[in-house]
């Protein structure tokens, strides 16, 4: 009976760990939950809520911004950040490239190298005539602690504590192989933690729009 209860407990732990999805974070806050809860968390970070525009305002990464909490089925799936003030073509190019460099040099992110705009690029012409879109996409790395918790929970469904403590080469090889397999399983079953930004043109002026997305909560067309 004790053994049965132990197995049930380990399976429950495994399911619970797996249910804790590794989602995109904004300022350390998971992009998830209800809109009202997210607004309160952002207010605690120093942002001010404007009930007229239904947006928050404040400073983010050295710039004055406006933030919108976007939901699907009452769950937050996106944090939308817009520069509060526009700027000219030269300044927006510098701002865009600076953001690219910041993401590239941030150990929490991965993405294609050199998504910057060249110095001789005519942004206004390309956007107006060729409808070119300037954007850069990066991905937050998976949470190592959550990966480890998932792997350990899965191992406990297959091995006893005594087996995991076995230091024999044969057992260690088996455990190492399973750790690798469970690690890949975690990666395959967790969606990308996407953070991207783009240049928005507004009658000759420009601003950066940035998006922190939780793909788990996005609409997948099942309501069609």
In which residue ranges do the predicted regions lie?
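Sec-dependent N-terminal signal peptides
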Residues: 4-17
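Non-cytosolic coordination micro-motifs
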Residues: 20-49, 85-224
């Amino acid at each position: 009976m004790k053994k049965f209860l132990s197995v049930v407990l380990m399976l429950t732990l495994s399911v619970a760990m797996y249910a804790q999805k590794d989602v995109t974070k904004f300022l350390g806050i998971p992009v998830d939950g209800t809109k009202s809860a997210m607004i309160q968390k952002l207010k605690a970070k120093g942002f001010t809520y404007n009930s007229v525009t239904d947006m928050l305002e404040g400073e983010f990464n050295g710039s004055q911004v406006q933030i919108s909490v976007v939901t699907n089925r009452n769950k937050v799936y996106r944090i939308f950040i817009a520069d509060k003030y526009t700027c000219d073509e030269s300044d927006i190019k510098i701002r865009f490239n600076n953001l690219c460099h910041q993401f590239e040099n941030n150990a929490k992110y991965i993405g294609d190298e050199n998504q910057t705009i060249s110095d001789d690029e005519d942004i206004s012409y390309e956007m107006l005539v060729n409808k070119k879109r300037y954007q850069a996409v990066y991905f937050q790395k998976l949470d190592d602690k959550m990966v480890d918790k998932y792997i350990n929970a899965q191992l406990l469904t297959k091995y006893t504590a005594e087996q995991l403590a076995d230091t024999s080469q044969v057992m260690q090889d088996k455990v190492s192989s399973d750790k690798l397999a469970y690690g890949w399983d975690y990666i395959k079953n967790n969606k990308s933690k996407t953070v991207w930004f783009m240049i928005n043109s507004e009658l000759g002026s420009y601003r950066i729009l940035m998006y922190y997305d939780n793909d788990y909560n996005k609409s997948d067309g099942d309501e069609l």
